[in-house]
Design a protein with these regions (language model features):
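Iron-sulfur-cluster electron-transfer modules
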Residues: 8, 26, 30-188
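Iron-sulfur (Fe-S) cluster-binding segments and ferredoxin-like electron-carrier domains
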Residues: 21-36, 61-78, 278-292, 317-328
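A general structural motif
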Residues: 108-110, 176-178, 203, 224-230, ...
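Conserved beta-strand elements of the Class I
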Residues: 112-113, 232, 308-309
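Active-site glycine- and acidic-residue-rich loops that bind
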Residues: 119-124, 238-256
Length: 349
């Protein structure tokens, strides 16, 4: 059985308790934060387990890399404190079961791009940026064979992840992949953060999509024409699992001549899209989600953004229309990069 690599001593010796003190959705002081995280570690009930909006951010805030969010999720499940309504959890668990037979395994013998469960977004990986890069999980009927499972962190179901993920890794490995460019942050976070945290072996090297895009743009540097757009980036929950890769957002903007507007809710202080808050269906959750979304979009607008750049399809689905309704054009990062090299992005709308 895979066990979380959590060290209680790190929490005891921590000087900041930043994992909870910095939380934007729970108001807590340092002393209370220390008490509550230790209660959680000991398997005791805590208001944190009940008030958590599952935004992943404490994984980034923790200065000790002690996996506070993974710990919270495991204890929510152990104490039967579901962050979402039980019918939604069960429906989500059932949705992730692979169906329609086994996928066709094509030998790649090198680098490939993994679409995961976003086979219907193949239009976002077209053009010269992706020339010559084999793609795994292109068939929507078979995409759940490549589903990274990490969505179930939002459901407090670590057991499902640990049960299903080894089979997913085995299926990917059968393609003889050495480097795996992950279309979605969540897939990258799975293989680069979650798997090591529970001692699950990954037989390939995960590569963040933004790192890939940046390096590919460097190769095509002579073709880049500055986009001259003022942009705001909607940072997704899953980006919190790979904070070391977040730097590529600004690096890409600098390379393609996009101006990142100065915002309050940016980088470590970013707000989530509010989708999971609304999905919690608790008293006041809809108003809370609406408030988060309002503050987020007003911040973009007040900063003068022309474009809101997305990486996560769930964030796009949740905020895209709201952003557009505020006069800001929503666009995926890959499409913005295509625009910079003179291509017409299929997803630009």
């Amino acid at each position: 059985m895979y066990e979380l690599k959590y060290d209680e001593q790190k929490c005891l010796s921590c000087k900041t308790q930043a994992c909870l003190v910095k939380c934007q959705y729970i108001d807590i002081d340092k002393e209370s934060a220390k008490r509550e995280i230790l209660k959680i570690a000991h398997g005791e009930d805590s208001f944190v387990l009940r008030d958590c909006v599952t935004c992943y951010a404490c994984e980034e805030y923790c200065p000790c890399n002690n996996h506070p969010y993974y710990l919270i999720v495991e204890k929510q499940e152990a104490l039967d404190i579901p962050p979402l309504p039980r019918p939604i959890i069960q429906r989500g668990i059932n949705m992730g079961i692979p169906f329609r037979g086994e996928p066709q395994i094509e030998q790649i013998n090198g680098k490939a791009l993994l679409m995961g469960v976003f086979s219907d977004l193949m239009f976002l990986i077209q053009g010269r940026l992706f020339e010559g890069l084999p793609v795994i999980s292109t068939d929507p009927r078979k995409m759940f064979h490549y589903f990274c499972q990490l969505m179930y962190l939002h459901f407090a179901r670590s057991s499902i992840i640990k049960e299903r993920l080894p089979k997913i890794i085995k299926t990917i490995a059968e393609h003889d992949v050495t480097e795996l460019v992950c279309f979605h942050d969540e897939c990258y976070g799975t293989y680069a953060s979650y798997c090591p945290s529970v001692g699950m072996e990954v037989p390939f090297t995960p590569i963040h999509l933004f790192e890939y895009l940046y390096n590919r743009l460097l190769e095509l540097k002579n073709e880049i024409k500055p986009v001259k757009l003022k942009v705001a980036y909607q940072r997704p929950c899953s980006s919190r699992l790979s904070p070391d890769k977040h730097r590529f957002v600004q690096a890409i903007f600098d390379l393609i001549g996009a101006e990142a507007v100065k915002r309050e809710y940016v980088d470590e202080n970013a707000l989530c899209c509010g989708g999971t808050i609304q999905g919690q269906r608790r008293e006041g959750s809809r108003k809370r989600a609406a408030d988060v979304q309002r503050r987020n979009i007003e911040d973009m607008k007040n900063a003068g953004a022309d474009v809101c750049v997305f990486n996560c399809p769930a964030c796009y689905s949740t905020l895209g229309k709201m952003v557009a309704g505020s006069g800001i054009k929503p666009v995926f990062m890959s499409d913005l990069c295509r625009l910079a090299i003179g291509e017409s992005p299929a997803g630009w709308r």
